[in-house]
């Protein structure tokens, strides 16, 4: 009986070890891809930063409270920016900007990016990005969320 118990514990330890290794493989699956390939919508941004992240928890509170859509869109952009920045805090901030007049039809479209530099101290702006490529990507990929945040009531 004691021998069977020890064998069972050994098997259990092996299963736990394999489970941890498998979990690590699953968690790192796709991590070698560029962040712009991994974050393609709000759902993948949440997967990237985790559903226990403070910004995701705040978003869920807003959704459950029935908050206005433009506020939800703002929080969605916070989550997306955080995911695209991969946990890094920029010292030069890049952000997408939009034009409200040139495009026939909708009157709102992505129109490039801007940037500014912070000297000396660490600063945080929740909707800014690490580089121009991320700003360009976010502006194009998430244009409709920006529209909901900035224009649509």
Task: Describe each region flagged by the PLM.
Residues 149-152:
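Subunit-assembly interface segments of extracellular/virion macromolecular structures
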């Amino acid at each position: 009986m004691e021998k069977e118990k020890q064998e069972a514990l050994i098997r259990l330890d092996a299963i736990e070890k394999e489970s941890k290794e498998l979990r690590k493989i699953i968690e790192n699956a796709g991590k070698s891809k560029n962040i712009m390939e991994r974050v393609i919508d709000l759902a993948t941004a949440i997967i990237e930063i985790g559903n226990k992240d403070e910004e995701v928890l705040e978003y869920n509170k807003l959704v459950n409270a029935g908050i206005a859509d433009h506020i939800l869109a703002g929080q969605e952009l916070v989550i997306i920016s955080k995911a695209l920045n991969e946990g890094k805090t920029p010292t030069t901030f890049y952000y997408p900007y939009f034009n409200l007049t040139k495009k026939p039809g909708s009157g709102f479209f992505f129109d490039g990016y801007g940037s500014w530099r912070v000297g000396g101290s660490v600063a945080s702006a929740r909707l800014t990005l690490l580089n121009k490529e991320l700003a360009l990507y976010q502006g194009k990929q998430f244009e409709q969320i920006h529209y909901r945040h900035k224009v649509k009531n």
